[in-house]
Amino acid sequence: MSNIVKAEEKFLSISKVIDSEISTVLASNVNGFQKAFVMSSAIDIIKEQLSDEYMKPIMALQGTSLGFKTDQDTVKKQVGGKWVAEKGPGYPMEIVKECLIEATFLGLEVTGNQFNIIGGNMYPTREGFGALLDKMKGLKKNFT
């Protein structure tokens, strides 16, 4: 078996663990301290799974409409008397991890520009709210 197939199987296995933890929290009918315990336990498990190796392809989604955008995607510099935008550094992996966990616990996806990172914090986007509304059974959109 090739290394690529092994890596894909490993990532798929990790993804299933993470998705299971998120589903457990989202489906949970507990409140108060019980909810805090369930959520904090799930966050610990997810953080263990989000290795640098696993995060590498997610970090590649930073700064794209197919992934998620940030306020660090571009940097404006003055070149020859004109301001030009250049690719910025983006956010470090630890901040992206925190925002990623927060977004997924709200039911947002990592793809499709469903959240942005601004000032190191996660904010749902119009696309994210639209996706959440699409998941609500019985909700009908009526734009007249």
Task: Give residue ranges: language-model regions.
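Glycine-rich anion-binding surface patch
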Residues: M1-T144
